Structure formats: structure tokens, C-alpha cells
Amino acid sequence: MSDPRQSQEEKHKLGRASSKFKDPPRIMQSDDYFARKFKAINGNMGPTTSLNASNSNETGGGGPANGTPAVPKMGVRARVSEWPPKKDCSKELTCKALWESRSQTSYESITSVLQNGQSDQSEGQQDEQLDLDFVEAKYTIGDIFVHSPQRGLHPIRQRSNSDVTISDIDAEDVLDQNAVNPNTGAALHREYGSTSSIDRQGLSGENFFAMLRGYRVENYDHKAMVPFGFPEFFRCDPAISPSLHAAAQISRGEFVRISGLDYVDSALLMGRDRDKPFKRRLKSESVETSLFRKLRTVKSEHETFKFTSELEESRLERGIRPWNCQRCFAHYDVQSILFNINEAMATRANVGKRKNITTGASAASQTQMPTGQTGNCESPLGSKEDLNSKENLDADEGDGKSNDLVLSCPYFRNETGGEGDRRIALSRANSSSFSSGESCSFESSLSSHCTNAGVSVLEVPRENQPIHREKVKRYIIEHIDLGAYYYRKFFYGKEHQNYFGIDENLGPVAVSIRREKVEDAKEKEGSQFNYRVAFRTSELTTLRGAILEDAIPSTARHGTARGLPLKEVLEYVIPELSIQCLRQASNSPKVSEQLLKLDEQGLSFQHKIGILYCKAGQSTEEEMYNNETAGPAFEEFLDLLGQRVRLKGFSKYRAQLDNKTDSTGTHSLYTTYKDYELMFHVSTLLPYMPNNRQQLLRKRHIGNDIVTIVFQEPGALPFTPKSIRSHFQHVFVIVKVHNPCTENVCYSVGVSRSKDVPPFGPPIPKGVTFPKSAVFRDFLLAKVINAENAAHKSEKFRAMATRTRQEYLKDLAENFVTTATVDTSVKFSFITLGAKKKEKVKPRKDAHLFSIGAIMWHVIARDFGQSADIECLLGISNEFIMLIEKDSKNVVFNCSCRDVIGWTSGLVSIKVFYERGECVLLSSVDNCAEDIREIVQRLVIVTRGCETVEMTLRRNGLGQLGFHVNFEGIVADVEPFGFAWKAGLRQGSRLVEICKVAVATLTHEQMIDLLRTSVTVKVVIIQPHDDGSPRRGCSELCRIPMVEYKLDSEGTPCEYKTPFRRNTTWHRVPTPALQPLSRASPIPGTPDRLPCQQLLQQAQAAIPRSTSFDRKLPDGTRSSPSNQSSSSDPGPGGSGPWRPQVGYDGCQSPLLLEHQGSGPLECDGAREREDTMEASRHPETKWHGPPSKVLGSYKERALQKDGSCKDSPNKLSHIGDKSCSSHSSSNTLSSNTSSNSDDKHFGSGDLMDPELLGLTYIKGASTDSGIDTAPCMPATILGPVHLAGSRSLIHSRAEQWADAADVSGPDDEPAKLYSVHGYASTISAGSAAEGSMGDLSEISSHSSGSHHSGSPSAHCSKSSGSLDSSKVYIVSHSSGQQVPGSMSKPYHRQGAVNKYVIGWKKSEGSPPPEEPEVTECPGMYSEMDVMSTATQHQTVVGDAVAETQHVLSKEDFLKLMLPDSPLVEEGRRKFSFYGNLSPRRSLYRTLSDESICSNRRGSSFGSSRSSVLDQALPNDILFSTTPPYHSTLPPRAHPAPSMGSLRNEFWFSDGSLSDKSKCADPGLMPLPDTATGLDWTHLVDAARAFEGLDSDEELGLLCHHTSYLDQRVASFCTLTDMQHGQDLEGAQELPLCVDPGSGKEFMDTTGERSPSPLTGKVNQLELILRQLQTDLRKEKQDKAVLQAEVQHLRQDNMRLQEESQTATAQLRKFTEWFFTTIDKKS
């Protein structure tokens, strides 16, 4: 037997080797450990060791004596010192030896010894009690551990130290019986971390309490009440092996007190102990749970932390004594941050000794063999270590997740849907009962963020940043070390130095170093140069990065041409490295080639994937291998997945298949995805051997594949890895087909991965099936590629890679070196001068903070998802901010520096806010204020955020705060000189905390309630930019995933396609999908979008927040500020299409397109839909670039003239306002600023989707979450339609409307009719938005002045079968006034005086209540339509009849209100499909925004009217002085002019807020198109009347409520649009609802002609309006002409193609005849 001490030390060095030794050595080691510790204890403690030893031995079962010795042992046990073993302990050692035979790790053995006496429960509880008493009498913890007075000595089961195993107890001990997991019968023994104690359930209830009595720790009282199932946990926590604690702590000379518990776990200790007290005390009660969770995580996920005490110490040491270079060294990538030279030293010896262990499917299959013994210490093969020494596996029970695809299996972890990236930040997802699965999945799937596992390179050159961000999209490839290209990128082919050597501690090492000039050195003053370093050891992590020359203390002068001595650079960066051992590499090209191989050894872009075919009723490996041929469903799947290739002669990646003799089959399946080549080993394509049931020829290939796809036909039994026997198969992706070989074929996916394979994306949405489509194919290919990459991180493959790496390094160090050492001399480096220079040139303070790479700090981060604190490494580069958990070595948080909006810094902590106000809370490890100061300074350098400001707000006499806030938490308006204004609150400020509650966790409604109800309102705000625009994250301003403009055949950017893409139909399994709109989807028969929307269900709220964009973006490209992305709230049915996708997929960024003004405005999506459009035959369907141009110009002109461009509230138009522009008076504070963003699902993928349209929100348009506004009445959605609501009725069109209005169904139940401002708009907007830009929200937006560019979508003919979103329905409200002909039956909204016109889009799923009654109002927007595209006619469109949603009945209304409501989704889908054709996003104006301003203005116009809600909830308005009016804005017709340009100009939230305040617009007055022939005099009169109305609350009723022209130049379009313009079809253009007569009528209706003169603005507006109308008319004419030309061109094209084909055929015939004739002649 080898010397125990020696082996022990080796184990320590290796860190993880402990479990790999056989029992005998382990015993010896343990003895050694124990002896050393005992000795130490004797020295320090009173009782003699001998006595203790004898007692413990004799007692053997828990006698009191036992306890005594145990105490001392425990005290020092964790300390691995060099004391020699003592004889005193011999007896105990002997006993220990017995236990050791079963112990798994050295720690376990130690523990067992320590626990021997007491652990033994065989003696019964009495003994135990005596034991405790005795121990207590003899020594109190106070005596032994001064710092831990209350820790019971209780030696027994308290071990919490990492490797000790509870199950290491005497074979005879009764404990064994108790130490069995009641669920599995498995012996509970320690794995790593304190988890072992957690798993230990041996204690009986009485024993447990006896133990508690012994400890006498009050803290545990509450635990006693915990269900008995957790005793093991208590065991682990309660005075958790104070000895172990003490051991580790003593080794450092410190104790840790965590919430009253001594909890020292080697895996968790690190620096945490020091910090924990600080953090933990803040939340003492949650500690246990969090610890429990944490432990569990450590145990199940990271065997890496099974450290022996020595390794622990090294880690602790590392945490305490960071490298000198840590701060100044800028890391290139994530794995470099994880590089730990101390760990490399400790594990070096282990490299050659790592054994292959049973992993993958074999581990699972072997557990069954000894059925009863799964839980025993012995594995099926005889040794747990054999089974999985990597984790010291005890019988793993699996994760308990099962479904009809896959069953829970030992040693495997399942992904059944809903799993997402870990979230530690404080966000709504973590704060509410969020279906984390869905939300995470979707967000991660659709968001522009890089997933945690997808973050690799942190240093991104400025010129590559846009491209880099674009790469972060659809289906991110994860777990790939892209930093491996560091050498190739920065060294290869350039002047640099390589040094190789064999370090006595590190083994073979290789260093590459290069000095380079810093490109962007202006701010860095002296930092003209930096040194790039790549340092490689046998460990797989490499130190890669750069250090600025000014940050290096040196004897030489900085900034000279010669540079600093390399020796000084290396000594500073890697002080642990022995520079003397390094020799310069030989000058051979082979050196660089070898280094490239070494660095890129882990990169592979060729993967082989197995595919097993499982028929109905099958589940076993043998059955699957014996399926000789594929069925039609499997063939269909294979055709989708890749292309069949003939193997013979195949020259690409063949994955060991025979391409010469067909011995492995004649064909195989091959495909490529991104940069990857995939060859599939398909079981049915590999040779079948009828006489060999095992089908070895097939298994030979598939069994050696790491990732296997298991294809299940309907009726197949759930898959379990237990049925597979293979050491290599680590991941199984199960794909089950539904409705095979039909148009509705779809697939559900599940994953089962070996427990040591980290999770990987893309996440599987919960309860969703994927339609057969290219998107599903991309999803599946990304999943298997990520699975392969992740599997290579498992211990088995890492061990193999490490051995290979070590050999490479050895070869370099031995065969490719010269005798030259590292150059230490520098010309003229005199010692004296050097010393002076060193002082003088001492690293320039904070020079490193200007580095491009990631500067790293040790911090403690608050994990809000698990309510725990975790020790992390914080890295901040020029592109990313990320946190890596030290224990798991996983990235747990990342965000782009561009998304950081602010931070709150304290002395030793900092809270960083990003995106929409989400935040991460960090504190320094050693309460080091310097760290926080540096972090803040670094943030200032790399982000556009700022320090937050805390202020306490007072209420005025009316209880108002004096400002409005939109759903995003952005202050839309502040009452001048009010209390809020005096406190320093300004428009554009962003609230991130209200009364200590993070705004990111609140819905708009909750936010408003908090502001309204809190006695003292304390807010933390982020000040706006200098120009007054709110600070926004980049992902809010523009959806990153707009990239990869490479289009696929469908015209959709390939990268963007997501499984949820609009062309795909996702079905939420549980819910029936609504009938999809017919659309050209790649797969015939697949409905355009189905339930996919459900996917989005994630949270409506989530999306809403970010609707607004920062107006700063010049191009307005931001499609949706918030990335509103995926979150459109799909209805419960989820059937709604996924809106967000559209944004991604369908359009590149519409905004961008618009911006360009290029005709291509049609987004890809639009193009995709072109077919549909054509079907509708609305030429207008297509967007032409010009309109956008035009609009932009109008906008600019008008706005600029006004100067309101930025300020005009109109700009605020919220696109998202689906709902009636969420007048959120409910917002109270937010006071209508909020637009309902929620409702509007942005990016739902509908054509109408603003995102698609590219009309992203105009200037900060904040889409309110409809939440607060829900109560709003559907403010008349139709601007024009406002007729009902507005006094002015559009008589001329009234009849038409009448029909539509007639939707009498709802009439019957007027009371029931609710238009939720949010929902109605959502619905209508949703529909409208989707279908027609004119939707409620749209309309309202329009009216608000937002110009909504019509969506190009043509009105789909009814044939499409869905209501035309373009239809407008008018609902009259309580106001008795009805528009003639329009809703003949007024609907009374309770409390609402106004009538509203509601344009609902019929949700696809919901039957239109009286469709027949509803008539389309095709003419409404005709003029605008042209521009916006007939499809947009949304509101007005005639198809509405059938499709129109009538007024909603109460039930429908409620449904709409529910985010999940299928109606909403359907509507949404529908609209989006039609309406969204236009690439531009329609702009929606939010009443609320306006109202805020107007209220503030105090002018009667007060926007208050603008929001319907306002009237209803006047009190909501925080400060408005004027009574709120319900005014519904008339929906704007799509302002055909391109909204895109508008977009830029107005970003709602931001701009509008500010603008509003500047311009008071009395409610917006809709201006009719000149086409209507409206007389200007009438217009003036109307305006006056309008003003007069303002004075009257009823004015609020005016649906019009159009904003000022100036602000709403776009809105003027609305009227025009409203005029039932010509249908795309060429329907005659209906005069605007308001004709001159109508105009008068309008005034008449108003009845109150207000004499008040309009200010000079009217004249100005008139001029602008005339010009705009003229331009508009011209544009329309041009557009009509262009449309006609396009149509002709198409026809000509078709004709030419036919003629071409005919000519070709004739030519062919002629040729044949010619040659035939010649042949005959010859």
C-alpha cells in the first residue's frame, strides 16, 4: 500500500482524485487525516487525546465518551496539515478503517471517524442524548471555538464538509439502515459539497430533536417544524459539523457564521465565508432554503467541487489572495476569467491518473441491473467510483421529470419544456409567479440577448460590434470556445514571442506574448501600447487577454518604442509562473501550427448524430435497432432534417461511414447548419442484419455518437436512457410526431442528458409543438449541435481532452525550444533609474479600466431567482457585463454594456440597472470600497448609464404627485413647478424603484397603484440624457436580432427564423389552435401562425415595457425598444401568432428599411405575405418606399415647423397602444402616458405588427401596458369612426359605418360592451394593429398624431377568412348620440359618457357576433390606404363585415382582457397577418401620453380628454388640473406616408413626453383630407367647436381627440384614411367621413361652438395641412400609378415567362429537327 500521506497529498493536489482511490488507500489517508487533526486538537484543547480516543473507540456507538473525542476531531478535521498521525487515535483509526471500507472520499472517511461515536445511531437515541450532554459538559463549543459559541460539538451526522459521507458509518451501525434514502433505498452518502448531509435521511425524528437538544441552538426551532422529509437538510445545516467548519475556517483563522448556522462547505466556502455573514444577515430566514438550493445545485451539477481539504484551501486562498494581475488584466473571453493557476497546480498530478468512468447511458442502464441496490454504496459494477467517480455518485435518482416523450432516469436530467436560462437578476420573471418555463424559453429564444451559455468572447472590436450583436440571434450556438481563435487572430502571422517550459508546479506550459499599439488610445492618454498574452497549462482553460502597458509597474519607461522587459510583464501577469523554466520557442513554422492545434483542439464543426427510429409500442434499444425500414412519418422527418446523400464517392464529412464499398449502407443523411456539417447515422439507413438481434453494425456507429435523436411515431412508449447501453451516448433528443403525413403534422421535443452535461439551448417552449417547417429544422439542428458542444464539457470528455493537451504541451516544451530565456534586459535599464522610474511610472492609477477586454472583480451577487447570495466573478468588457458563479463556473448573468441604463452605488455594494429597469445587486467580497469605486468607473467608461438619484416626492393638496409615468416607468410629463418638479424630477427620467420596489417587477397597474397609494413616495430615478431623452437599453431601441440578412427562399432572414416564426404554426399542445390565417407558409398546409403565440404567453407585461424607443436612434431602426419581443402576450390560447417573431423573422428591421425609404420596405415578412396580398389582389398591399419617404418628409416638415417634432406628444403615439392608447388614466401617475404596450403584442409576427411594419414606436413611444388602461373604453378606435364617440359624426360615411356599427349583437348588451382600452385596443389594436394599422390603438395613435403608416397589407379579401383587421366597428357609448347609421344601438359603457367607435378585429377564434350586421367600411382609409396599403384599412376596411368583431360582449371583453385569451391572439394573428404587410410598424399614439401633457397644460384640451380613461378615472391623473375627459381619439387612418420616418422623429415615450409638455394640444383635432372638400372655414369652426368641447367633459367623448396637427401631422392622415378611400381593389374612394357638411355637422354635433379662437397655430397648421394634403394626394396618385404599373409589370413578367418557355420549347424542337435532318442527310 502506498504511503497514506503521500496519496493523500496527491489527492489534494488533484482536487478531485479523492474519489478515485481504492478503499485501502483511502483508509490510510483518513487515518492520517484524523491523526493529524486529533493531534492538533489535543494541543489546543484540554482533554487528552488518548482519553478521547479511547472513549470514542469504546463507545463505538454514540457513548458520551464518543462525543468528546469527536469534538476535537471535528474542530480541526478539515485542516489538512502536515502533522504526523498519532497513536492515541489508533483505536479510532481502526474503527475508521472499518467504516472507510465503504467510504467514498477522504472527507467521508474523516467524517465517519468523527461521527463514529455519535453517528452511530445503532445505540439508540438515549445514547445519543447522553452523548450530547456529555460532550456539552466536557467542552462547550465556546471553549473550543471561541467564535462559534453556540455550535454544538455534535460530531455526528453534522458533517457538512464537502467530501465527508454520512454513510461512512460502521457497517454494524444501525445508522446504515437509517442512512438509506427512503425513496430509493439508496445508501445516502456524501457526494460533494454539503450536499451529502442533505441527502442523509437516517435520523429519526427523535434523534433529530435529541441532536437539537444537544446543540441547544435556538435557531433551529423553526426547522423542527419543517416536514420530516428534510431532516437530512437540517443535519447538514445545524451546527454542521462544526468540526469541519472549523477545520476549513481554522485553516484560514476565521469562522463563518451564517444566519446562526455554522455552515462550512468546502464547495461553498471559498471567499464566501467572509462575505456571507454580511450578506446572509440581511436575510437570515431565507438562508436555509437558499443554502439548500445552492447545495443541491452544487451537488447535482458540479462534481468539480468535490475537493479535498487541500484543494479547498487553495481555492479559499485564491478567493482571499487574488492574482496581482486580476484587476489590470483584461480577459479576452469567459474561459480566461475562469483560468485559475492555483487550481491548475493542484490538479496537475491528476491529469495522468484520471480514469475512464461509467458515464452516459451506461451509468443509467447499469443502475437497473442490481435493481435493489441502486442506492447502495456499491454500484452495479461493484464500485460507486467506477460508476461515476466524477461525482462520487451515489445512486442518482434522476430529476423526476417525465412526460409522454421521456421518463425520469437515474444519472440523467430531462428537459420537457419550459426550462430557460438561469436568472439571477431582479426582474418580473423572478419576482412573480411567472411560468418561468414559458417566459424564459421565449425570451431566451426570441430575445436579442446572448444566452448565458452562448457568451464566449468578451472583447469585441468596435468595428465588429454591430456584426457581433447581430450574431446574437436566433438559435445561438452555445458551449463553444470561440476564444480559441485568439492565437490565430492576434498572434499567428504577426510578430510575437512564444516561450515553452516545464514548470515544477504547473507541468508543461506555453506562453505567447505580443506587444501591440492600442488603436483607440485617445482617452487613455499614455496607454499607447498593450501586451497580449496567451498562457496555457495542462488544464483546458487558457489565460487569454491583454494588459495595458501603463498598468504594468516596470523599471523601464512606458510608451517607448522598445517596450518593457517581457520578464517584468510575465512576472506581473502570472506571478506564480517560474519564468526561469521558460525557453524561447524555435523559429519554426511548425511551432505556430502546433499552437493553433493546441488552442483549437476543442473546436469542431463536424458532428455525427445518431437517429433511432421508435415505432408505436416500442421503447427498448433492441426494438429500435431492429426496425429494418423507415415508415412514412420517419421518412418525412428525415426529409425535413437533411438531404440523403450517396455514400459512395461522398467527399464531405462522412462520420466514419464507408464511402468506398457501401459496407455501412448506400445512403446517409447529411446537412449543414451555420458553420457546422452534420452527418446523421440513421438506424434504418445503416445495414440491417436479420440474424443479429443486437444489430451490431448499426450500434457500432450510433452507440459511439454522443448525441442521439430518438424519433417516436405516435403510440411509441416514453423513452428512457436506461434502455441504452453505451458509454458515449450522453444526450438524447426525443422527437415525437403528431398527425404525421398530413398538413397539420407537427413535432414535440424533449431532451434527456447525462447529469454532468450542462444545460443547453435553445430552450424548448412549454406545451408547444413545432409545425413542420424550416424553423423547426433550425431549432432541432441548433439543439443537437449545442448538445454535442455541452457534452464535451462533461468530465469524461474533459479528461480525455486534458490528456491530449498535456501531450501537445510536453511535445512543444521538449522538442521546439531553443536555449534562449525570457529577455530580461532593456537598454539603459540602470537600477537607480529603474527604481525612480518605477516609482514614477508606477502603474498609472486605473489605467486598466480603459481596457477593451473584461476587467474582473470578485463579488457576491444576489440571486433573486433563488433568494441566495452567490460568489461570482464580475467581468466588464467593452461589450459585455457578465457574472460567473465561482462554484459552478457557469455564466449566470450577461447583458450588453449598451443595455446598462444606470446604477446605484453604495460603499460596498452596487445595483446595476439594465434594459427596462431589471437589476443585479452586487457587493464586494471583502467589503472593499475600492472595488465598487472601480466598478462604477468602469461602467462610466463602457456604458451610457449614469448614477441613479433617490428622491422623496410630496403630494399636492389634491393628493397628486404632479407627474405622469408611462408603462415603462419613464416620466412622460411633469407639472411645472410642482412638488415633483421641485424635487428634480424631469420629463424623460426613468423610475427604476418606487418605494424600494423595482419597477421591473411591476406591471403598469401595480406601478400606478404604488404611486397612488403610498403615503411617502420614494423613488429612485435614472436621469435622462442631456438632450432630455430617456435612457434606454440598446435592446429596447432596436431588436438586435435583425441580423443575418441572408434570406432564405421565403425571403426571411434565415437566422431569424424561429420555431415560432409566423410562417410556422406552433400549437400549444393543450390548446386547440385557432384557424390560422392562410398565408404562404413554407410548408404547404401549415397555418401561418398558430398557437405559437401562446409561446409568447410569457407575459404580456413583459413586453409592454419596452415599447418605446429612444428617439435618439437616428434611423429609428429600433424596432421595438423593449424587444417587446416575444412577449407579446398571447392569449391564453396562445393560438395567437407569435408576434415578436415577426419582427425578427419577417422583417429585417422594418425601420431600417423604412429608413432607407426603399421600396423594400416590405419586410421579408411582407414579402412572404406577398402571396397573400396578391391573393387579396390589393396592389396597395405592397409598401413602396416612397410613402415612407413622404411621410417622413411630412413629418419632418410638420414637426419641425412645430418644433414639436421631438416634443410633440403626438410622437408619443404609441404603437403599442393597441388598446385605446391605454389611456391609462388608471395610470394615474402614469396617467395616460402609458400606452398599452401589452396589449399590443409587438412583434407578434403579425404583419401589422408594428415591428414588422417597422413602424416601431415613434420616439419612445411607450406602449402602455394595457394593464392599467384596461378600464379604458375602446376609445373610438377609428379615428374617423370616432364619429360615434365624437360629436362630429361622419354622416356621409355613417351609413357605411352604420352597417358596421350595427354589429348589433353587442347592442343588445350595451352594458356588456367593454372596450378595454388596453384590450380593445389590444384586440382591435391587436387586430387592427395586426390587421390594420388603423386599429384602435393605431387609430388612437394616429389620432394622437402618431402617423401610422398603413400597413402594406392589403385588405385581405374575406376569402382569407379572417376579419379584416381593417374593418372598423363603431360602438356608440352611453352617450346617447349615435352616429346615424353607425351603431344604431348605442352601447353604454358604464360611467362613460362617450361613445366609442371600436374597431375590433375579429379574433380568428371568436365568431364575429353579428358579422352580417357589421359592414366593412372600406372607404375609411382609402386614401391613406393606398399609402398604407389596403390591408391596413384596418379599421375601415369593408371586409370587416364578416371579419369584423362586433362590439364585444362582456364575456368577449373579458376574454380579450385576459392576455391568454385566444380571441386576442387570434385577432392579433389575424391582424398581424393582414395588417402587417406593411413593413413599417404602424405608430400608435397613446392617449395617455397626450393626456398627460394636455392635462398638464391645463388647457381644456388637456390631453386628459385624450384618454378615455381619464374621464372615467380623473383621479388617476396625478396632477392634471383639468377634469379628464373621456375622449377617444379617432383612430388615425393609416397615415399612409411612411411612418417610418416619423418613427425616427418621434419616439414616444421619450419624445412625446417632452414634447407634450411643450405643446398643449387641445384634444387632437382630426383634420379631414382635402379630398373631402372640407372648407377651411369649416375646419376652423370645427376646431373652435373642438376647443369648446374641451371645456366640456363630454368633449372627451369626441373620439377624435386628434392631437394637434403639428404633433399629429400624421394624424391628419387618419381622416384621410378614414375617408373610405379607394379600396385597393380600386373601390371608389369614399369621401372622408367628414365632408364639408360633415365638418359642419361635427361642429353642430358638438353643439358647442367654441368662440375661442385658435392661436396662430391654426394658420400654421392650415399651411402644413394643405401642403401635406397636396403631397399626400400626389403620393397617392403616384402610388396608384405605381401599383398599376407593378401590376402590369407582373402580368408582363408572367407573359414573358410563358413566351420564354414557349420559345424554349420551340427552339428545342427546332434543334432536334435540325440535327435529325442533318443526320439523315449525312
UniProtKB/Swiss-Prot annotation:
Residues 1093-1102, 1119-1130, 1219-1236, 1337-1360 have a biased composition (Low complexity). Residues 45-56, 360-377 have a biased composition (Polar residues). Residues 1654-1712 form a coiled coil. Gene3D superfamilies: 2.30.42.10, 6.10.140.210, Rap/Ran-GAP. GO terms for biological process: presynaptic signal transduction; regulation of small GTPase mediated signal transduction. It comes from the Eukaryota. GO terms for cellular component: cytoplasm; glutamatergic synapse. Keywords: Coiled coil, GTPase activation, Phosphoprotein. The keyword Coiled coil applies. PROSITE patterns: PDZ, RAPGAP. Residues 1-29, 42-72, 360-401, 1067-1245, 1330-1360 are annotated as: Disordered. It holds the Pfam family Rap-GAP_dimer. The modification Phosphoserine is found at residues 148, 379, 383, 1029, 1244, 1461, 1472, 1478, 1488, 1549, 1552, 1591. One of its GO terms (molecular function) is GTPase activator activity. InterPro entries: PDZ, PDZ_sf, Rap/Ran-GAP_sf, Rap/Ran_GAP_dom, Rap1_Ran_GAP, SIPA1L_C. Residues 1-12, 383-401, 1164-1183, 1194-1217 have a biased composition (Basic and acidic residues). SUPFAM superfamilies: PDZ domain-like, Rap/Ran-GAP. Residues 595-812 form the Rap-GAP domain. Residues 950-1026 form the PDZ domain. CDD domains: PDZ_SIPA1-like. This is Signal-induced proliferation-associated 1-like protein 2. It comes from Homo sapiens (Human).
